[in-house]
Amino acid sequence: MPKIYRVVGDTSTGMKFVVEVVGERPYDALEKVYSVLGSRHKLKRTQIRIREVSVVEPSSAKSNEAKMLMVLEKVVRY
């Protein structure tokens, strides 16, 4: 069952971040954060420092995208 994870950390450029992502386990959430920050800010994995990964209840999540993904029963890719 997927869960919403809140990932807190900072980068070597001094930028702090809090990202909420949906994943089956914490490892999946970390991979998504590395992917998103790498593509948006052109950061390498070694430039991203993860401070905390925690499970968040859907009712207390701040990300609308994460809330909507939790409502879906299944996703079909073509």
From Swiss-Prot:
A Pfam family annotated for this UniProt entry: Ribosomal_L18A
Q: Name one GO cellular component term.
A: ribonucleoprotein complex
Tell me the GO molecular function terms.
large ribosomal subunit rRNA binding; structural constituent of ribosome
| Keywords from the named record | Ribonucleoprotein, Ribosomal protein, RNA-binding, rRNA-binding
List the Gene3D superfamilies hit by this protein, alphabetically: 3.10.20.10
Q: Does the keyword Signal apply?
A: no
One biological process term in Gene Ontology: translation
Does this UniProt record's set of keywords contain Ribosomal protein?
yes
Return the InterPro entries for the record: Ribosomal_eL20, Ribosomal_eL20_dom
Record family assignment = Belongs to the eukaryotic ribosomal protein eL20 family.
| Subunit details | Part of the 50S ribosomal subunit. Binds 23S rRNA.
What is the name of the protein in this document? Large ribosomal subunit protein eL20
- Tell me what organism the protein belongs to: Pyrobaculum calidifontis (strain DSM 21063 / JCM 11548 / VA1)
